[in-house]
Amino acid sequence: MVGRKALLAQHPDAVLEAASHDAVRFFSSHPGGIGGLDALKTACLAGVEGFSIQVAKPPAAWRGFRFVETLGVDLDRLDHACTLFEGPAREGVPHFPQNVNIAAVLALAGIGMDRTRLKVVADPALTLNTHTILVTGRSGRFTVVLENVPSPDNPKTSSLACYSALAAVRSLGSRVRYGG
């Protein structure tokens, strides 16, 4: 089971090659904050024209990233929402490997890392890690907004992340599965 989804996003061809062998299967637990994955996969069958995800978190969640430092953003003095990145998921995910796993999974399950738009925001008004997912396509459109409590031990991730891994393991052993 893969825990760090950003690694999958950085090496998708290697993952697909390894998974092409009969004895190899990759299982990725859903990141703690993810929702709408089944709807996205279903919409892709009908045809997705646009897909974006915004990951907005309190400034503390973005500390320690070299990319943020190169922007010159002072997270301790931030008094308004600040866009740290906006562009293709392929370009943004490597800059925030601990924070945007949800974008990596959704992009890989959806229309790919190049066509998925990612916006990363540090917002001092937030107390929750917020993910806004917007999908448009031939079957219609949907928006999913998730607001998760940050992990007390690691504000870069949701407090649901460890439960997500447990749910994935439980699902592997279950004879009945709902969704994905």
Which positions does each model-derived feature cover?
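Short beta-strands and strand-loop turn motifs
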Residues: 1-2, 146
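Active-site-lining helix/loop region of Rossmann-like oxidoreductase modules
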Residues: 27-180
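Rossmann-fold NAD(P)-binding glycine/threonine-rich loop
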Residues: 2-26
